[in-house]
Amino acid sequence: MVQHLTAEEIIQYISDAKKSTPIKVYLNGNFEGITYPESFKVFGSEQSKVIFCEADDWKPFYEAYGSQFGDIEIEMDRRNSAIPLKDLTNTNARIEPGAFIREQAIIEDGAVVMMGATINIGAVVGEGTMIDMNATLGGRATTGKNVHVGAGAVLAGVIEPPSASPVIIEDDVLIGANAVILEGVRVGKGAIVAAGAIVTQDVPAGAVVAGTPAKVIKQASEVQDTKKEIVAALRKLND
């Protein structure tokens, strides 16, 4: 199973990162004689521009040239952000629109991350694992291979306090919708976590747990294969 950054490494990374407040500015006006800073990315025509820049760089630019502008619309979706979204260019997985995957998360080959899922810094999505809609992998949460994390489920993150152990999900585990796996819990290979369960203690390999707090109710070997099947076709990428 892939291991990634320690809590201390993540904390140092966030502390050292240059905090960013990127904005997108839509402008109409007279742009004659305007000099744009090198940090600006500028697109558009003679009468209309779209500018990508940092909020702190925009202020002096506007003070210098604001009288030449007409309509202005500014979009800002973060403030002093330390962690950008992950560059997915070389990720060999299926990532659907609306998934939020932060830099320093690992997405292994053949994984699937569905709409609305959130993968925080230091988290690991194992090979062939599916993270369903609106599920959350907190900081350093780690899944093995061929895991299914159901819609709305939460694998709690542990960056603060740094001494806490991360959630570990071993291979071939099924986690039902809206289940919650608390900090430090390890779910053993082939286990099944029922929908809505709150897991506060380690789950033995091959066990089925349910309830609040979750308790072992039977063994995965007693569950019909059709109810615990991981479908390879859903992980298939282009040939």
From Swiss-Prot:
A Pfam family per the record:
Hexapep
Provide the alphabetized UniProt keywords: Acyltransferase, Amino-acid biosynthesis, Diaminopimelate biosynthesis, Lysine biosynthesis, Repeat, Transferase
This enzyme catalyses:
(S)-2,3,4,5-tetrahydrodipicolinate + acetyl-CoA + H2O = L-2-acetamido-6-oxoheptanedioate + CoA
| SUPFAM superfamilies to which the protein is assigned, alphabetical | Trimeric LpxA-like enzymes
Judged by the first EC level, this protein's enzyme class is transferase
Gene Ontology process terms (BP):
diaminopimelate biosynthetic process; lysine biosynthetic process via diaminopimelate
Regions crossing the membrane: none
GO MF annotations for this entry?
tetrahydrodipicolinate N-acetyltransferase activity
Q: In which pathway does it act?
A: Amino-acid biosynthesis; L-lysine biosynthesis via DAP pathway; LL-2,6-diaminopimelate from (S)-tetrahydrodipicolinate (acetylase route): step 1/3
- Entries under InterPro entries matching the protein: DapH, DapH_N, Hexapep, Hexapep_transf_CS, Trans_hexapeptide_repeat, Trimer_LpxA-like_sf
Q: Which Gene3D superfamilies match?
A: Hexapeptide repeat proteins, Malonyl-CoA ACP transacylase, ACP-binding
Signal peptide stretch: none
EC code: 2.3.1.89
Which PANTHER family does the record cross-reference, listed alphabetically?
A: 2,3,4,5-TETRAHYDROPYRIDINE-2,6-DICARBOXYLATE N-ACETYLTRANSFERASE, ACETYLTRANSFERASE
What job does the chain carry out? Catalyzes the transfer of an acetyl group from acetyl-CoA to tetrahydrodipicolinate.
Protein name according to UniProt: 2,3,4,5-tetrahydropyridine-2,6-dicarboxylate N-acetyltransferase
Species of origin:
Staphylococcus aureus (strain MRSA252)
